[in-house]
């Protein structure tokens, strides 16, 4: 399939920025800083332009003192190490990083249409066509990650951005691991945790299949499937896979079938990601371009 000229231009810009990042040591004076794009627990994200190339990026500014207080320096180093080596259209690029006495700066790809979470809040829930397009895009990105021995472990709406063309981008690799074996640590977001992580037993890449199933449900219904008033009830519902499909909104049997095949307690029995892409609901609803056009 031919790539549009605009996409080629964007990819060349991204490639140039990445090559430049690898060749030099950045400082804040290399950038014109623009409007704030968002704020997080450890700092802020700004729109920025690299002066020499005129390339527009998102500059994530993190305060060292806050990272140290929360003991997440190791997590940040891991995020930088993993994300800087990933090259996929549905994964936000990390071009490089630099630091000064007080702050750490991450030079990130700019996703012009912003946070998916805000879109979901505004719409309440997505159409099956939109949900399927996003789920298929994420499945392809996760297949790529798993092929590189990277497990994300924290797929959720808050960690997804939308690019200028409407393509989905995985944006946060703070909980991801580069692994060749099974792990036992608990991480990620409660509503999205699979049974094996709730029960603190070994887990592998199939945790991302579970999280993608939760995400698909939330796209279609507007809430995660095991949500409850008390944490203990959420834990119980996850472990028992207490999966219920409300009567409203009306969702196709095919969509429910896909979700049911992903949200399986025995991790080895979850629908593999390559099979997900062949599922009738994905085939019939997902835009093959991976781009949802509003």
Curated annotation (Swiss-Prot):
GO cellular component, one term: cell plate
Phosphoserine modified-residue sites: 176
UniProt keyword annotations, A-Z: ATP-binding, Cell cycle, Cell division, Cytoplasm, Cytoskeleton, Kinase, Membrane, Microtubule, Mitosis, Nucleotide-binding, Nucleus, Phosphoprotein, Serine/threonine-protein kinase, Transferase
Post-translational modification: Phosphorylation at Thr-185 may regulate activity and degradation of AUR1 in a cell cycle dependent manner.
Protein EC: 2.7.11.1
Alphabetical list of Gene3D superfamilies matching this protein: Phosphorylase Kinase, domain 1 (3.30.200.20), Transferase(Phosphotransferase) domain 1 (1.10.510.10)
Domain of life: Eukaryota
Residues reported to bind ATP: 37-45, 60
Pfam families tied to this protein: Pkinase (PF00069)
Enzyme class, first EC level, given as a word: transferase
Main localization (coarse): nucleus
Subcellular location: Nucleus membrane; Cytoplasm, Cytoskeleton, Spindle; Cytoplasm, Cytoskeleton, Spindle pole; Cytoplasm, Cytoskeleton, Phragmoplast
Gene Ontology terms: biological process: cell division
Similarity field: Belongs to the protein kinase superfamily. Ser/Thr protein kinase family. Aurora subfamily.
Function in brief: Phosphorylates specifically 'Ser-10' of histone H3 in vitro and colocalizes with phosphorylated histone H3 during mitosis. Associates with cytoskeletal structures that are necessary for cytokinesis and with the microtubule spindle. Also colocalizes with gamma-tubulin and function in microtubule organizing centers (MTOCs). In contrast with the mammalian B-type Aurora, AUR1 has no kinase activity toward 'Ser-28' of histone H3.
Protein name per the record: Serine/threonine-protein kinase Aurora-1
Source species: Arabidopsis thaliana (Mouse-ear cress)
């Amino acid at each position: 399939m031919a790539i549009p000229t605009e996409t080629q231009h964007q990819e060349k810009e991204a490639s140039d920025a990445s090559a430049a990042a690898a060749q030099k040591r950045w400082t804040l004076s290399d950038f014109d800083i623009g409007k704030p794009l968002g704020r997080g627990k450890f700092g802020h994200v700004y729109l920025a332009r690299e002066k020499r190339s005129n390339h527009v990026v998102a500059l994530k500014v993190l305060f060292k003192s806050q990272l140290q207080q929360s003991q997440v320096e190791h997590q940040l180093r891991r995020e930088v190490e993993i994300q800087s080596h990933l090259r996929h259209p549905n994964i936000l690029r990390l071009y490089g990083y630099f630091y000064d006495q007080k702050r750490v700066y991450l030079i990130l790809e700019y996703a012009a249409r912003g946070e998916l979470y805000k879109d979901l809040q505004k719409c309440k829930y997505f159409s099956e066509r939109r949900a399927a397009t996003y789920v298929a895009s994420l499945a392809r990105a996760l297949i790529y990650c798993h092929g590189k021995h990277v497990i994300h472990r924290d797929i959720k709406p808050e960690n997804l951005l939308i690019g200028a063309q409407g393509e989905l981008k995985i944006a946060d690799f703070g909980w991801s691991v580069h692994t060749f074996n099974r792990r036992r640590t608990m991480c990620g977001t409660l509503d999205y945790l699979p049974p094996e992580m709730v029960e603190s037993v070994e887990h592998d890449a199939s945790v991302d299949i579970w999280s993608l199933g939760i995400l698909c449900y939330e796209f279609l219904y507007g809430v995660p499937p095991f949500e409850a008033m008390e944490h203990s009830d959420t834990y119980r519902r996850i472990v028992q896979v207490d999966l219920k499909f409300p009567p409203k909104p009306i969702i196709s049997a095919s969509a429910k079938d896909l979700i049911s095949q992903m949200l399986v307690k025995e991790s080895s029995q979850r629908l593999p990601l390559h099979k997900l892409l062949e599922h009738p609901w994905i085939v019939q609803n997902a835009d093959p371009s991976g781009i949802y056009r509003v």
